Amino acid sequence: RIKDIRILKDAKDMVYLNVGRNDIKDITCLKDMKQLEIISLENNNVKDLTPLTELTNLCDVDLYNNVIEDLTPLEHLEFISYLRLDHNAITDLTPLSKLKYLRSLTLKANYITDATPLKDLELLEALRLDDNPIQDTSVLESMKFYEKFTN
């Protein structure tokens, strides 16, 4: 299992990166990979997404099964269209409200109680919120694609 990905720090022209199913905690070396479009970091121990803040070409992001709590570093990555964040420690979806091109979002098994920040994501076609303690589902019911999910 890979724990350290610092060897990638000079791969600035990389477009696709899959380092899923490892034991990676620190993704600081990714901060200068401005060409990245697809990144797969699933099944690691990533908590801090700050290094992704300026990776504005990202469109497909797999971050499920990590220890992520704060989504703020993703809020300006407006071209993300596919985002997988299942099995993390997320409570606040507010940063995702700015991702206007988001088409598919999976957030199963987090600690989300309010889905209101997602209500204006007009291109969203698929949303999974299973196993979250969402208190008021009325905002979801008003979304055009709403499909029943279970808590």
Please place each PLM-identified region on the residue numbering.
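Concave beta-strand-loop units of leucine-rich repeat
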Residues: 1-3, 7, 12-25, 29, ...
